[in-house]
Amino acid sequence: MKRIGLFLLTNLAILVVLGVVLFILQAVFGVRTLDEAGVGLDYTGLLIIAAVIGFGGSFISLAMSKFIAKRMTGARVIEKPRSEAEQWLVDTVRRFARQEGIGMPEVAIYDAPDMNAFATGARRNNSLVAVSTGLLQSMTRDEAEAVIGHEIAHISNGDMVTLTLIQGVVNTFVVFFSRIIGHFVDRVVFKTEQGHGPAYFITSIFAQIVLGILASVIVMWFSRQREYRADAGGAKLAGRDKMIAALERLKRSVDQEHLPDQLEAFGINGNRGGGMKEWFMSHPPLDDRIAALKEGRHLRG
């Protein structure tokens, strides 16, 4: 319930901010979605508004990602290690961050029985790496080291920003085309001659939901490609055998509890599925990831 409530509040805050921005664009700069006669669409104005909504939402979410991640998982940032395991975790993150030439991320632990970890943050030098208690308790040090390397690779590769940009582009076109569909239905089916009637808003919302679901296939495809690169980065930092062993340990685990959907793309242990469900998965199947490492695909020099 806390996770759902926090998610709704975050989205409400984003909508309020975007609403103010759009009001300024329309009232001060004269940006509009209809032509001066109020009959046809002003495609330039519509595209500007769609871009503001699409990229605005993505970048606000990115800017708040560390705060949201900590609240959603209840992660505790390690200010001063309380145990040998915490000291090892901080030292390992620091060592890999130096090797990759990035700033020292915040290191956190969150209480969860599943073996998982995630990385997030708006910039490579201002990021967060969080590890579950289940991972620290269930994995060997070699396996855990590989997982940490995987998360550091996400940061080093700039995956958070990359996926934010992709999501922004996708969002822009979803909003743009959903409004065009809404306008068409309002004019052709409901015969609204000037301005926009209720059918425009209802149809636009419905079209945005449908197009958003379809567009998520594109975002998830990119996410899966970045996951292969993060595995390769983890192999480079910790060793290929350790990375393979970590993925095989995840494969053997059962009844895994997943991270919140908003964080899953940057975890180590992604969602599972088969058939068409794989189109909407943020992570490739573990068998494919293991095979890619064994074959040396995606490995960096």
UniProtKB/Swiss-Prot annotation:
Q: Name one GO biological process term.
A: proteolysis
**What keywords tag this UniProt record?**
Cell inner membrane, Cell membrane, Hydrolase, Membrane, Metal-binding, Metalloprotease, Protease, Transmembrane, Transmembrane helix, Zinc
EC code(s) of this entry: 3.4.24.-
Under PANTHER family, the record lists: PROTEASE HTPX
Record's bilayer topology term: Multi-pass membrane protein
Q: Does the keyword Transmembrane helix apply?
A: yes
Q: How is the cofactor bound?
A: Binds 1 zinc ion per subunit.
**Active-site annotation:** E151
UniProt protein name: Protease HtpX
State the organism named in the record. Alkalilimnicola ehrlichii (strain ATCC BAA-1101 / DSM 17681 / MLHE-1)
What GO cellular component is one of the record's annotations? plasma membrane
* Pfam families named in the record: Peptidase_M48
Q: Which family does it belong to?
A: Belongs to the peptidase M48B family.
